[in-house]
């Protein structure tokens, strides 16, 4: 009996550790995503019943059940110290406090908007379909593409090397 209790306690610890493993890739549809630098990984969803949250292929996605009307409809607070990828549709990104990362990819579509303060070695940004993004901070390399009446404001971003800054008219 003692061995079974120890086994179950160990199994519970392993499952809890795996569940709290920090996620580094995010997708949002219809949400305001607020990223806050923190050594402790934590996520708070304003009203979890409004949407679905799913982890698949190392991407944590937040998708509203009702995609009609004005967006965003709910807010997600993400406390983390490491982000690799943020993808958004009909959403808003808020990261006013600086994040220090090696590489970051941000993709905005369908009228998404936001502000990102970052210190990165490599920063890839893609904005499409009327999206607006303000970048602050610094990066060694910036790879930026805009399409379909979108804009990326880099006035407050110090860039050492701009590998691509292209605008495609569609």
Model-derived features: positions:
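Intrinsically disordered, low-complexity terminal regions
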Residues: 1-109, 113-128, 132-170
């Amino acid at each position: 009996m003692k061995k079974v209790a120890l086994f179950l306690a160990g199994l519970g610890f392993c499952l809890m550790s795996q569940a709290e493993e920090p996620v580094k890739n995010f997708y949002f549809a219809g949400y305001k995503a607020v990223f806050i630098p923190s050594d402790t990984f934590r996520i708070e969803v304003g009203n979890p019943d409004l949407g679905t949250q799913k982890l698949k292929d190392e991407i944590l996605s937040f998708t509203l059940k009702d995609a009609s009307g004005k967006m965003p409809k709910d807010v997600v607070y993400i406390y983390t110290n490491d982000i690799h990828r943020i993808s958004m549709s009909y959403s808003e990104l808020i990261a006013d406090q600086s994040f220090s990362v090696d590489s970051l990819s941000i993709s905005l579509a369908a009228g998404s908007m936001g502000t990102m303060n970052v210190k990165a070695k490599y920063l890839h940004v893609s904005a499409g379909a009327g999206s607006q993004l303000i970048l602050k901070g610094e990066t060694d390399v910036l790879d930026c593409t805009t399409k379909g009446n979108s804009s990326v404001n880099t006035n407050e971003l110090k860039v050492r090397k701009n590998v691509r800054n292209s605008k495609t008219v569609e």
